[in-house]
């Protein structure tokens, strides 16, 4: 099923539908737009017909210099059976030749009052967001001190309980159990909850609770960029866990690598506080402050000083 259709951008940007109403359900498959300036001159060899076509003052002013026959030919070739739509910006008058051709091919022709560059930018951002590669991950996404923390782990390890404690401590829930992740840009992953379970949290023994109703609108978010992955696992006495934090583990989601921390779970450990400190420490590292490296440097200096004293 197509993620975006022409009718979606008509509603989103409040576009005026001028003609070609039969084609408003055409799918939009790419976020790239086309400004068919060279096509107005008659060169259609590399015409990207599958894109939204955006006509501004430049294209239409050149179009007006053409003869009537040329105008008809250009618009006939501009309107194809795979063109999702043609948008006229700045509220400019729509050429009658375009209306005729669009009605024949059922290509929606829309008009916007926005300036061409602004419309192009907003439309591209919207389509990139909607058409971004997506995946779904089993886990909980929480906004902790402005850091999007994805908490993963096996069922029953305590992900939802940790999220509940974090919300009680003033942080915000984004998604529980299933996190839908979109790669909106290179290195940018944005997580959100499926519409069916938005703002809901499941606690074993309590059932499903509505976090917005219980804690207010300030306790939830609709989406958040993911910066850190924390994997909860049951404590294994035979496994060596990182005690210094010098080595940074990575996990790949879609085409993006994220920092991953593995936190062992055992009775008596306050996971919510650990997640809070992990988020703050992650922010410090991004600001250039690394406690593990500072300790390592101090230790090296102490060893070297000791060797000099021994000599």
UniProtKB/Swiss-Prot annotation:
Q: What does the entry list as the binding residues for Mg(2+)?
A: 160, 202
Kindly give the Pfam families that the UniProt entry links to this protein. Hpr_kinase_C (PF07475), Hpr_kinase_N (PF02603)
Active site location: 138, 159, 177, 243
GO BP, one annotated term: regulation of carbohydrate metabolic process
List the cofactors. Answer: Mg(2+)
InterPro entries xref list: HPr(Ser)_kin/Pase, Hpr_kin/Pase_C, Hpr_kin/Pase_Hpr_N, P-loop_NTPase, Ser_kin/Pase_Hpr-like_N_sf
A GO molecular function term, named singly, is: magnesium ion binding
Q: Where is this region: Important for the catalytic mechanism of both phosphorylation and dephosphorylation?
A: 201-210
Q: What is its EC number?
A: 2.7.11.-, 2.7.4.-
Q: Which UniProt keywords are listed?
A: ATP-binding, Carbohydrate metabolism, Kinase, Magnesium, Metal-binding, Multifunctional enzyme, Nucleotide-binding, Serine/threonine-protein kinase, Transferase
- Name the CDD domains on file: HprK_C
- According to its UniProt record, this protein's enzyme class is transferase
Annotated ATP binding lies at 153-160
Which parts of the sequence are annotated with region: Important for the catalytic mechanism of dephosphorylation? 264-269
> Reaction catalysed?
[HPr protein]-L-serine + ATP = [HPr protein]-O-phospho-L-serine + ADP + H(+); [HPr protein]-O-phospho-L-serine + phosphate + H(+) = [HPr protein]-L-serine + diphosphate
Per UniProt, subunit arrangement is: Homohexamer.
Comment field on protein domains: The Walker A ATP-binding motif also binds Pi and PPi.
Q: Kindly give the NCBIfam families that the UniProt entry links to this protein.
A: hpr-ser (TIGR00679)
State its role: Catalyzes the ATP- as well as the pyrophosphate-dependent phosphorylation of a specific serine residue in HPr, a phosphocarrier protein of the phosphoenolpyruvate-dependent sugar phosphotransferase system (PTS). HprK/P also catalyzes the pyrophosphate-producing, inorganic phosphate-dependent dephosphorylation (phosphorolysis) of seryl-phosphorylated HPr (P-Ser-HPr).
Q: Give the protein family.
A: Belongs to the HPrK/P family.
Name of protein:
HPr kinase/phosphorylase
Organism from which the protein derives:
Geobacillus sp. (strain WCH70)
